[in-house]
A protein has these predicted regions:
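Transmembrane beta-barrel wall of Gram-negative outer-membrane proteins
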Residues: 228, 232-255, 268-320, 343-369, ...
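Gram-negative outer-membrane beta-barrel transporters
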Residues: 511-517, 621-624, 643-730, 820
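Short, acidic Ser/Thr/Gly-rich low-complexity loop/linker segments typical of extracellular
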Residues: 39-51
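Membrane-embedded beta-barrel scaffold of Gram-negative outer-membrane proteins
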Residues: 368-372, 379, 590-649, 777-782, ...
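Structural signature of Gram-negative outer-membrane beta-barrels, strongest in the C-terminal barrel
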Residues: 46, 432-434, 455, 492-615, ...
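Short, acidic, small-residue-rich periplasmic hinge/interaction motif at the N-terminus
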Residues: 22, 32-37, 65-72, 81-125, ...
């Protein structure tokens, strides 16, 4: 309350003017120039929804002017305005529109790609420290069940079925990551992002051979100095950008430590995670002379632009577990207590570099060339022993954190169902390198937009894996089959792969007007060849978008195509088990790409409510997958069978309501319903078993991202992220036909931020703060309600050889304080 009162007194002499600029059809107009004149002059422009906001210091009359090419200028006078003034303006056209031109307040979706506001990642509460993925998981059809990870699954697909592009270049992730605790920073640095687009299915042929989704990110090119520095309990970020009319540069350094977050896990111990990331993006426009007249430069044919994108990341994870005490089972309660010895040491080093050249050779033709390389060196080492006691009794873990064992009144002791010792061991080393040379182009002529591309890729991977687990008992808790002690689990292998890929695509978009509205048709195809199995993959794709003439506030789209999930190294690892129970890895040269037929039908409805723009999106989809490769999921590790041994399908409905619940700030709610099933094949001949849930099936999901502020105090904002998702299926060890379902994943993250700038805080006008654009202080509460979410299970057996699944819980309630300084 004291802070609010003080802040109010600071900006009491200023007037905040805000509102919407619309056309005669009540649609917001983007890029309208808004000027306010009094003792000083302030200016701004409207956003894509027609919203504007400015602050001006004035004691008397304010002159307002709204202007845009093609519209009549509107002027208004405010005499001694209040501290907060809302003015909505309607502009009328003063010229005759060409038939082909449409002006819309909210950009209409002309395909399956949806826009994402990257700026929200700076202020949204996020347990990973701030990432684009933290916004993405609130979209319809996108799910995540681990707040420590930036990985996500889309419409029943696995983590590996999602493709990520930065400036048109595909980026890769480390391969050995098995848990969210090991996972470091997302590749994408939100401070460097200009534009983000996402498709949950039915995407165009220009995007690669993945079956689930595409995340397409474009980095910005600053034309002046800008910088930011932020620090919190989860790490620190430093960003610097600079540029002019001929060059630009950006540098970002991020440090993340999740030690504080990991303190809320079920397993007590000494966590030492440290993650560092450096990223740079440099551009240089060849042949352009320096000038301050950027408008004059834009009138000329664009010169060739050279760019370099570089990234280096180091994930260092050390863990020394101490103990675990957990209750589970509800009415048939059980208690599990484990005492650990040993430690885990993991290190993941990843480097990425891309050199690009892009230029217009004519007014209609644009060409581009890319040379990129990716290298990863991953080590995973642990030796951990544990002694466990499984007891009857204990309180339901959903109701209490207190762990007790049932006491036998006659014996006066707990009813111990099983005791034992286990030892987990791993010495895994993987080195992988990928080099890609690509060309792409675009030809725009009339109503046609033709795109094409071709690339060659070389892959070299060496992998050594040695991991096993054995379990012993006191002679009764695990039934003995003989004098020899068999390993509970073992996997060994030394593999090397050297391969080449060639792929290309061509697609054309044709737009035309009919008596029934505007139509946009995109038709294209991809072709890929891989030297490992000599497989050729043809992938035809098509989509059509219709803007009906009878109602400009609607649009409808249909997309379909044949999609392939071309295997990479992880999918190739087939296994053979010998008589001693040791599983050995071999690379399967007969493995074929998974194949999927997609059909996506969707539509958008644009409307205004309470004087503000809204958009309702609905998409129904169906995917049938054959030549499917079954897999299991443990935490975030995906382990494939190495065989085309199953088939499956996914179908569902996604709904999203997007709009401005308060002026100038985006919010949305999403709902998804789906069904994803699979069934195993017997040696590729005939069907075996029944349809069972796919490992990533979540039958329903509700999410919300909400932002709010006080009209009299717009610099104080509140941010809410809410997730309610169906639990993931899980399967008993060595029996993938016996399955259950985890409890619902539910989570509420809340944040509040306060921004200080020259217009709202007197101390920001001091000479010493002239290079400071804004200070932002943010307080966050993760998992506000303190729900205990399950991520995976630890399986133990009692004396009767009955298996029990002890849940591994994720983080509880945590608090975070973050300070951000923006420089200019």
């Amino acid at each position: 309350m004291i802070l609010v009162c003080c802040a109010t007194s600071v900006f009491a002499r200023h007037t905040r003017i805000y509102g919407y600029v619309t056309d005669s059809d009540n649609r917001g107009i983007e890029l309208v120039n808004v000027f306010a004149r009094c003792e000083q002059q302030e200016g701004t422009s409207t956003n894509r929804n027609g919203f504007y906001e400015l602050m001006i210091e004035c004691q008397d009359t304010v002159q307002l002017e709204f202007s845009m090419l093609g519209y009549a200028t509107v002027r208004q006078r405010l005499i001694r305005p209040n501290e907060v003034v809302n003015i909505n303006v309607e502009l009328t056209t003063e010229t005759e529109w060409l038939q082909e031109v449409e002006v819309r307040g909210i950009q209409h979706q002309t395909g399956t790609l949806d826009q994402i506001d990257a700026s929200a990642a700076r202020v949204m509460p996020d347990a990973t420290g701030g990432s684009i993925e933290s916004i993405l998981i609130t979209f319809a059809g996108v799910n995540q069940n681990n707040e420590l990870s930036s990985q996500y699954n889309v419409r029943g697909g696995s983590f590996d079925e999602n493709e990520v592009y930065v400036n048109g270049i595909e980026v890769h992730r480390p391969l050995l990551i098995r848990s969210g605790q090991q996972e470091g920073l997302s590749f994408v640095n939100p401070e460097m992002v200009q534009n983000v687009q996402f498709s949950a299915g039915g995407f165009d042929a220009k995007y690669g051979d993945k079956m689930a989704s595409v995340l397409d990110i474009e980095y910005k090119q600053p034309d002046r100095f800008e910088a930011s520095l932020s620090a919190s309990l989860l790490g620190a970020n430093l960003y610097v950008g600079h540029g002019d009319s001929t060059y630009s540069q950006m540098h970002g350094i991020r440090y993340k430590t999740s030690q504080y977050m990991l303190g809320g896990l079920s397993t007590a111990g000494n966590y030492q995670p440290n993650f560092v990331d450096y990223q740079t993006y440099l551009t240089w426009q060849v042949g352009r002379q320096k000038t301050k007249d950027r408008f004059a430069q834009r009138q000329k044919t664009n010169p060739w632009t050279m760019s370099f994108l570089g990234n280096f990341s180091m994930n260092d994870y050390r863990f020394r577990p101490d103990s675990l005490s957990e209750s589970f089972g509800g009415q048939n309660a059980r208690s599990l207590n484990i005492w650990y010895e040993g430690q885990e040491k993991d290190r993941f080093l990843t480097g990425f570099a891309a050199l690009s050249a892009r230029g217009k050779v004519s007014r209609e033709v644009e060409l581009g060339f890319d040379l990129s390389g990716f290298y990863t060196h991953e080590q995973e080492n642990f030796d951990i022993t544990g002694e466990y006691v499984l007891s009857a009794g204990g309180e339901d873990s959903e109701q209490s954190n207190t762990h007790t064992a049932e006491v036998d009144p006659a014996a006066g002791q707990s009813q111990v169902l099983g005791t034992g010792i286990f030892h987990q061991h791993a010495r895994n080393l993987l080195r992988a390198g990928v080099i890609t040379l690509a060309h792409h182009g675009e030809w725009t002529h009339g109503r046609n937009r033709l795109r094409w591309g071709v690339s060659g890729q070389a892959e070299l991977i060496r992998d050594h894996i040695s991991e096993w687990q054995w379990r012993d008992s006191a002679g009764y808790s695990l039934p003995q089959a003989g004098p020899a002690m068999e390993l509970y689990y073992s996997m060994r292998g030394d593999s090397a792969m050297q391969s080449a890929r060639v792929q290309g695509y061509v697609q054309n978009t044709y737009r035309w007007l009919t008596d029934h509205g505007q139509v946009s048709l995109t038709v294209g195809g991809r072709l890929q060849w891989w030297s490992w199995n000599n497989e050729v993959l043809p992938s035809p794709r098509a989509s059509v978008v219709w803007f009906p003439g009878w109602k400009h506030d609607f649009s409808f789209r249909l997309a379909t195509g044949l999609y392939y999930q071309a295997p990479f190294y992880k999918e190739l690892r087939d296994t053979l088990t010998d008589a001693l129970g040791i599983t050995r890895i071999r690379l399967n040269r007969d493995l074929r790409a998974q194949r999927s037929v997609h059909v996506v039908l969707g539509g958008d409805y644009y409307f205004r409510a309470w004087g503000r723009p809204f958009k309702l999106t609905a998409e129904a989809y169906y995917k049938y997958i054959d030549r499917m490769e079954s897999y299991s999921v443990d935490n975030v590790r995906v382990r494939y069978s190495g065989k085309n041994d199953s088939e499956g399908y996914a179908t569902g409905l996604d709904l999203k309501l997007y709009g401005e619940l308060v002026p100038g700030v985006d919010s949305w709610i999403s709902f998804s319903a789906m069904r994803a099933r699979q069934r195993l094949m017997a040696n590729g001949e005939g069907l075996k078993g029944e349809w069972i849930p796919s490992p990533q099936e979540q039958r329903y999901a509700f999410s919300m991202l909400f932002q709010d502020y006080l009209p009299q105090l717009p610099q104080l904002r509140f941010h809410l992220k809410m997730l309610f998702q169906d639990g993931m299926p899980y399967y008993a060890p060595r029996n993938n036909q016996s399955w259950g379902r985890m409890p619902m994943y539910k989570r509420i993250d809340l944040g509040a931020s306060y921004a200080f700038n020259r217009k709202t805080a007197r101390f920001m006008r001091a000479e010493s703060a002239k290079h400071v654009k804004q200070w932002t202080i943010q307080f966050e509460v993760f998992n506000l309600v303190g729900w205990k979410n399950v991520n995976s299970y630890f399986w133990v057996s009692d004396a009767y050889n009955q298996q029990w699944a002890s849940p591994n819980y994720l983080t509880g309630r945590r608090f975070n304080l973050k300070v951000t300084v923006d420089l200019q």
